Amino acid sequence: MGAENDASKQNQQIQEMIDMGVDAVFLCPVDWEEIESALEALKEAGIPVINLDTQVKNSDLTAAFIGSDNKNAGYVCGKDLKEKCPDGGKILIFEDKGINSVNERITGFEQAISNAGFEVLNRADVNGEKQKAYEQMKEFLKQYSEINAVMCGTDEGALGVLQAVNEMGRKDIYIYGTDGCPQAKEEIAKEGSAFVGTGAQSPINIGKDAAETAMAILEDKDYEEKIQEETFIINKDNVELYGTNGWQ
């Protein structure tokens, strides 16, 4: 079930799953805190939860967590930016404070660029939405004459920033996202594109490990309670290795 980024809807969907008598739930929470009441209901019903990608705040209510090394996903973007701007520069940060995985990405990015001459001009909470990022970036472009780079906690936000940058003819700005989605890789591969890199994860590996973990739980076998998948930079130097037609 897709919650369409609506925490209340997701909680409602989980109650429907409980009523259906499902054996297990794979969960990527819209909001890592607001999901708690639904998790308590699942626990009371004896339904194990395999938490994916974004870790819930109270991990005691889940059976396992399979996700990406989100801090590293942001860190590799910051490291790449330092190579492009060795003297530092002026940057913007687009985040999503309600999603812990995005918070970790931004933390990793800021750790990578600390003490390297970078100034954060402003930050925006765009909830990972392309349209919100687009509208906010248009305002920032009017507000700041000098912007060297933009770090986005999701590729979707980065694509919105890219749209605004392209419309304003500001391709001198370096844009980073995180996820490694096909559309982001397609933009990175374009000659002259301002989208220069993404801290990539592998949903394929997450899904594979999640399925194996669920089977182990249901069959009462041993399993790893926490699995962290590798994250890595995809930029113009290596995007062809990963392709643009699907996820890695």
What are these regions (language model features)?
Residues 24, 29, 63-64, 90-98:
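Short beta-strand segments enriched in small/hydrophobic residues
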Residues 101, 111-113, 180, 202-248:
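Hinge/cleft segment of the Venus flytrap/periplasmic-binding protein
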Residues 1-3, 90-95, 110-131:
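Short beta-strand elements in bilobed, periplasmic/extracellular small-molecule ligand-binding domains
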Residues 10, 66-91, 132-134, 158, ...:
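Hydrophobic alpha-helical segments within soluble ligand-binding/sensing domains
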